[in-house]
């Protein structure tokens, strides 16, 4: 497992990516969800990917984690980054897996580069929804993004700062905010720390 690898793309942007599991295993590009990064697979653990015979390659999307921002980009721009990374790693074919908002990037790869893919999988993909479908905290986020983006940025900085709180305080706050099933997952030993790493 190597959680930080940096690659310079042809347009001089930096792309950060992590690798998990068996380096000789079946190659799978993992596209993280919203609000997380290339560290999201830490939630499952490197040993799980090794056990499954997978080589998981998890890049940060532009402007996330340690990858440089790319102005005016669309979903299809992502496929160029994926192809360059795959070529750099010597991978002719690979699978793609996207979680939540990473699903749109899987769809872009399936549409633009089907000849390079073994398979394309979306897990808990984002859907067309209204704010009424969301948890109250997420509803507020969408409204802030739309009407007061500067205030959303401030709230995200405060949220990020709260992730550095002592674990017992953080768990107490999360217990109030999360559904019981999600909170139960975070109570497992080491899970909270890995979740915080993925979000930072």
Place the predicted regions along the sequence by residue:
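An N-terminal hydrophobic leader/cap segment in hydrolases
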Residues: 1-6, 18, 200
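Conserved HGGG/HGGXW glycine-rich cap/lid loop of the alpha/beta-hydrolase fold
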Residues: 13-66
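Short glycine-enriched, charge-decorated loop/helix-capping segments at active-site entrances
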Residues: 69-74
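Conserved acidic catalytic loop of the alpha/beta-hydrolase fold
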Residues: 77-95
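Conserved hydrolase catalytic core segment
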Residues: 92-136
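Flexible "cap/lid" loop of the alpha/beta hydrolase fold
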Residues: 120-162
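Alpha/beta-hydrolase
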Residues: 150-200
């Amino acid at each position: 497992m190597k959680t930080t690898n940096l690659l310079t793309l042809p347009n001089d942007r930096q792309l950060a990516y992590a690798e998990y599991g068996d380096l000789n295993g079946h190659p799978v590009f993992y596209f993280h969800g919203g609000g997380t990064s290339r560290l999201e697979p830490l939630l499952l653990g490197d040993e799980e990917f090794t056990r499954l015979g997978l080589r998981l390659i998890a890049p940060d999307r532009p402007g996330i984690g340690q990858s440089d921002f790319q102005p005016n980009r669309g979903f299809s721009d992502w496929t160029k980054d994926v192809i360059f990374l795959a070529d750099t790693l010597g991978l002719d074919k690979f699978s793609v897996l996207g979680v939540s908002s990473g699903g749109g990037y899987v769809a872009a790869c399936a549409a633009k580069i089907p000849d390079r893919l073994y398979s394309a999988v979306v897990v808990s993909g984002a859907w067309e929804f209204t704010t009424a479908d969301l948890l109250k905290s997420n509803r507020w986020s969408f409204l802030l993004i739309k009407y007061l983006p500067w205030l959303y940025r401030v709230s995200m900085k405060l949220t990020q700062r709260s992730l550095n709180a002592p674990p017992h305080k953080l768990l107490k706050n999360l217990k109030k905010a999360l559904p019981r099933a999600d909170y139960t997952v975070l109570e497992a030993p080491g899970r909270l720390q890995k979740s915080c790493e993925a979000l930072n």
